Amino acid sequence: ASTIAMAFDECAPALADRGYVEASVARTTRWLARCKAEMTRLNGLEDTINKNQMLFGINQGAIYPDIRVDHAKRISELDLDGYAVGGLAVGETHEEMYDILDQTVPYLPLEKPTYLMGVGTPANILEGVDRGIDFFDCVYPSRNGRHGHVYTNQGKINLFNQKYEKDMRPIEEGCQCPACRRYSLSLIHISE
C-alpha cells in the first residue's frame, strides 16, 4: 500500500473561465470531505491494510489567486496529513505559477508537508522550495535520463553526444557521488 493517498480533485484548465473554476473547486472540496470520511471509516476496520496511510488534499483554482487562497483556507480546516498544490504547469507561465505559490502556500499549514504536483525542473524545484514546497513529482528526471541528459555545475549535457564516445572523465570533475566516482562519460555514452 502507498504511504500517501491523494484525494480526488478536478484540475481545471489554467485558462478556464472563473465560473467554471469556482464550480470545479467546490466539487474538489466536496470530494475531499468524502475522501476523508471514507478513509476514517476504513481505518476503523480491523482488516484495513495500511492504517497509517496519509491523506493529502489538493489545492486547485487555476490562475485565480483569490480562489486558490480561499480553497487553501477551506482545505486547511480539514486538518489533513498534508497538502498539495495542483493544477499548475498546465499552461500558465513560470512567473504566474510562482505568483500563485507566493499567494497560496502561506495559507496551507506550515507544520504539514506541502507537495507541488507535476513540477520538477531544477529551476522550478529551487523556486518551489524557496516558497515553502517540500516535495515534487515530475516525469522530467526519467525523461531526461532516457535521453542521456544530466545536470552538472556547468549546466545540462547530453551524454549520448558523439563527443563523449572516448571521454574518460567523470560526469562532474570533483564530484564524489557514486555515478561520478564509478562511471566515465564514455562508458555512459556507449551504454546508450
Regions found by a protein language model. Give the residues of each.
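Residues immediately within or flanking Cys/His clusters that coordinate Zn2+
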Residues: G174
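Non-catalytic, usually N-terminal nucleic-acid engagement modules in DNA/RNA processing proteins
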Residues: A1-T48, Q162-E165
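Short cysteine-rich clusters marking metal-coordination/redox-active sites
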Residues: C177
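Residue-level detector of conserved catalytic or cofactor/ligand-binding positions
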Residues: S186-E192
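Active-site-proximal helix/loop capping residues that flank conserved catalytic or ligand/cofactor
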Residues: A26, K73, L185-S186
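Glycine-rich phosphate/ribose-binding loops and adjacent secondary-structure elements
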Residues: E38, L42-G44, N50-I171
